[in-house]
């Protein structure tokens, strides 16, 4: 996931690099999608699948501009499924790829795609910035974003402590030397470039800036530099293993990824997470937090015993509360991992645009047979998947325990 996130920041979203696609619809028709002008769309035979769907999508976009503007927040993540906002490109052309990208198999089966490839920077380095509190790391992140970093990852004390008590810490301890101050949060600030000398200049300038801020009483108390892919990979391996260790907690309660990928504008992230932590603490839950602070994405997995019926009720309560919280901070419940079984909240985030989203579903799948209950139905009153009504392994585990 870490490498995916870094590529996303460098190159943009999938839809930015899909040149054309071929999809098979439920009727057996094939749909060829690409970016075309209004004139090219109008010139297509009216009986063709491309004309029928292309003209309908164009009308839905052009007739709902105010609703689109209100529904789609200004984020570097997207209100996926269905991306009506980007049916028109910045040049005014029609991009039929945009609706299929992120549709989670609800519109058709993509059988072929032509994509654009971009070169990745060859040089890489990372600065591990250390804090006495996770909130200090979060509040500092916005300022750190002003220095040209490729990515900024944050990790809380729960995840850090798991790493410190694991053998993986031996490989990165040099970057986190002992201090009289207690390490409770880190920002991992990655820089990339195509030129080694240019990268070194950026990183050294950033290091000097951190020294100056620390001397003036800034939030961080230390930092260390990892240069080159081998050293950087050591740090990322620590982060990856620590997150994996979250899933191995002792006892019946295990981290559950149901509010896994909230996303808010980066400038709202620190106060958003502050309230998010208060929400989870009020339910006396254990949890670990990590995320992509430059993108405003937070990953959190509260520990629940899903064999207990009251935990399922709590999962519903927490999700409802987090939905309200993300709306308050102009964000999304799903910043990276799609809607899936959380689709019941799609009408909340699409708002007045939701009927148009349902029209897209009806255009492609009027019988609601492709991944039914996810993202949208062919009519606004079509039932959607609910998080506390999907089959869970815990249901089977409960029968084993009871038996």
Give a label for each model feature.
Residues 3-9, 173-177, 308-312, 352-359:
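Short, structured secondary-structure boundary patches
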Residues 90-91, 97-317, 323-325, 329-332, ...:
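C-terminal substrate-recognition/cap domain of FAD-linked oxidoreductases
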Residues 52, 56, 67, 198, ...:
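Exposed alpha-helical structural elements
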Residues 1-141, 366-377, 381-403:
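FAD-binding subdomain of flavoenzyme oxidoreductases
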Residues 5, 12, 79-81, 193-196, ...:
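Glycine-centered flexibility motif
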Residues 16-19, 23, 95, 107, ...:
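Active-site capping/gating regions of soluble enzymes
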Residues 7, 13, 24-45, 154-162, ...:
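Non-transmembrane, interaction-prone segments in cytosolic or luminal domains
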């Amino acid at each position: 996931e870490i490498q995916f996130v870094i590529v996303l920041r460098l190159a943009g979203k999938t839809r930015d690099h899909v040149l054309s696609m071929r999809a098979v619809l439920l009727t057996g028709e094939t749909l060829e999608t690409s970016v075309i002008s209004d004139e090219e769309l109008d010139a297509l035979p009216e009986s063709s699948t491309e004309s029928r769907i292309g003209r309908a999508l164009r009308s839905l976009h052009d007739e709902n501009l105010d609703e689109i503007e209100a529904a789609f927040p200004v984020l570097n993540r997207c209100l996926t499924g269905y991306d009506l906002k980007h049916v028109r490109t910045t040049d005014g052309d029609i991009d039929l790829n945009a609706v299929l990208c992120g549709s989670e198999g609800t519109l058709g089966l993509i059988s072929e795609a032509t994509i654009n490839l971009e070169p990745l920077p060859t040089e890489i380095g990372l600065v591990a910035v250390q804090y006495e509190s996770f909130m200090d790391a979060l509040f500092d992140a916005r300022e750190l974003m002003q220095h040209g970093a490729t990515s900024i990852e944050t990790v809380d004390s729960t995840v850090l402590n798991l790493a410190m008590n694991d053998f993986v810490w031996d490989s990165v301890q040099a970057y986190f030397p002992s201090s009289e101050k207690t390490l409770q949060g880190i920002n991992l600030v990655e820089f990339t470039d195509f030129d080694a000398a240019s990268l070194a200049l950026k990183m050294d300038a950033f290091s000097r800036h951190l020294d100056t801020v620390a001397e003036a009483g800034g939030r961080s108390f230390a930092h260390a530099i990892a240069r080159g892919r081998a050293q950087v990979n050591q740090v990322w391996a620590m982060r990856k293993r620590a997150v994996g260790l979250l899933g191995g907690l002792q006892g019946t309660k295990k981290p559950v990824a149901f509010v896994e990928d909230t996303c808010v504008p980066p400038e709202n992230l620190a106060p958003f997470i502050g309230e998010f932590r208060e929400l989870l603490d009020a339910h006396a839950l254990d949890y670990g937090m990590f995320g992509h602070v430059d993108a405003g994405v937070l990953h959190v997995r509260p520990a629940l015993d899903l064999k207990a019926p009251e935990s399922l009720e709590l999962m519903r309560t927490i999700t409802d509360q987090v939905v309200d919280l993300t709306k308050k901070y102009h964000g999304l419940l799903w910043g990276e991992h799609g809607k899936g079984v959380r689709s019941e909240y799609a009408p909340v985030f699409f708002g007045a645009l939701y009927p148009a989203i349902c029209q897209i579903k009806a255009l492609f799948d009027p019988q609601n047979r492709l991944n039914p209950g996810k993202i949208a139905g062919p009519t606004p009153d079509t039932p959607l998947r609910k998080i506390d009504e999907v089959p869970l392994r815990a249901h089977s585990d409960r029968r084993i325990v009871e038996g």
